[in-house]
Swiss-Prot record:
Gene, per the UniProt record: rtcA
Organism field: Thermococcus sibiricus (strain DSM 12597 / MM 739)
Record field: catalytic activity: a 3'-end 3'-phospho-ribonucleotide-RNA + ATP = a 3'-end 2',3'-cyclophospho-ribonucleotide-RNA + AMP + diphosphate
Positions contributing to ATP binding: Q100, F290, L291, G292, D293, Q294
Record-stated family: Belongs to the RNA 3'-terminal cyclase family. Type 1 subfamily.
HAMAP family: RTC
EC number: 6.5.1.4
GO biological process, one term: RNA processing
A Pfam family that the UniProt record links to this protein: RTC
Protein name: RNA 3'-terminal phosphate cyclase
Length: 350
């Protein structure tokens, strides 16, 4: 049985998501020890359990230690013959983080897999589902991966209640991804939403983001969709707001996002998202810092060479987890917090 040290690096949920997904892909049982050992509240938290239990359902696995506070987890996968996965997160736990665990394993299923997940679509410390849908999936398509995601209802902290459905197709031809530098930004797009709030919140967020982008990129077209609901016809548990914006370049899309909070003016939310995106575009590297770590499990099997706007701890952790399974796969350049490069030197064939 392969043993993974859950305290490596940041020692957070990233190790769990990637290690258990790779266990499902390879069919190899794993034991994760020292889970979140360096944290003030060590062991599994509820948000980590959702991803693990979803992967358990997908692979009909036997699991030991999948409970809150547990610092060790054993996972024995069987096969990915399940056709539908349903995950119910009772809080505003992140739907995106559950999908980050599920997607790498789902693409290796023999047939299409559908999913439905209830929880948080737009919550702190995780990419919004809009980011996953418009930026992550766009990049995965270049690798030959087809995934459909539909946001039926948004969910915000603390009430959650977001509802996302989708379909993952078996990964056929694995195409390497070469995404080094971009030359041209064709346009900016985005989605600014406000639920159980006045429509002007979404409108002001979008306007502030547009103005901030125009100051730096005056000649590039910008189109930000404003999403809001009539009082009495709003299906959300809410209230909540947020904005995701992205640059369409000649290579991939780079993104930035921000969340509304009680007492935080909509203009600040819009400007925060624009600032995050502008920072990602500065080095002219084709992969933004939020996407880099998400691509690692897929690049392992497809090959490629990506240049990231910023090396993050999450990126380094994901490379480390992959190499616990397969030995040396990647070559990396760059320090944490600086632009960097990640190249596959030994693609894994299953």
């Amino acid at each position: 049985m392969r043993v993974i040290d859950g305290s490596y690096g940041e020692g957070g949920g990233q190790i769990l998501r990637t290690a258990v997904a790779l266990s499902v892909i390879t069919g190899e049982p794993i034991k994760i020890i020292n889970i979140r050992a360096k944290r003030s509240n060590p062991g599994l938290r509820p948000q980590h359990l959702h991803g693990i239990l979803a992967l358990k359902e997908l692979s009909d696995a036997k699991v030991k230690g999948a409970k809150e506070g547990s610092t060790e987890l054993e996972f024995y996968p069987k096969s990915t013959r399940v056709r539908h996965v349903k995950v119910l997160i009772k809080t505003a736990g992140s739907i995106s983080l559950v999908l980050q665990a599920l997607l790498p394993a789902m693409v290796f299923a023999e047939e299409e897999v559908t999913f439905e997940i209830t929880g948080g679509t737009d919550v702190a410390w995780s990419p919004p589902v809009d980011y996953l849908k418009h930026i992550t999936l766009y990049a995965l398509e270049k690798l030959g991966i087809k995934v459909e995601i539909e946001i039926r209802r948004r969910g915000h902290y603390p009430r959650g209640g977001g509802f996302v459905i989708g379909k993952v197709y078996p990964w056929g031809t694995k195409r390497p991804l070469v995404a080094r530098t971009f030359d041209k930004i064709y346009s900016f797009e985005g989605i600014s939403h406000a639920v159980r709030l006045p429509s002007h919140v979404a409108i002001r967020q979008a306007k502030a983001a547009k103005e901030a982008l125009e100051r730096v990129y005056p000649s590039i077209p910008i189109k930000i969709h404003e999403e809001y609901y009539e009082q009495g016809k709003d299906p959300h548990f809410g209230p909540g707001s947020g904005i995701v914006i992205w640059a369409n370049t000649d290579v991939l899309r780079l993104g930035g996002d921000a969340l509304g909070e009680r007492g935080k003016p909509a203009e600040i939310v819009g400007r925060e998202a624009a600032k995050a995106l502008i920072e990602q575009l500065g080095p002219r590297h084709a992969v933004d810092k939020f996407l880099g770590d998400q691509l690692i499990p897929f690049l392992t099997f497809a090959g490629g060479d990506i240049w990231v706007s910023e090396v993050t701890k999450h990126l380094i952790t994901n490379v480390w987890v992959v190499e616990q399974f397969f030995g040396r796969v990647f070559e990396m350049e760059g320090e944490i917090g600086k632009p960097g490069k990640v190249r596959v030197v030994k693609k894994v064939e299953l």
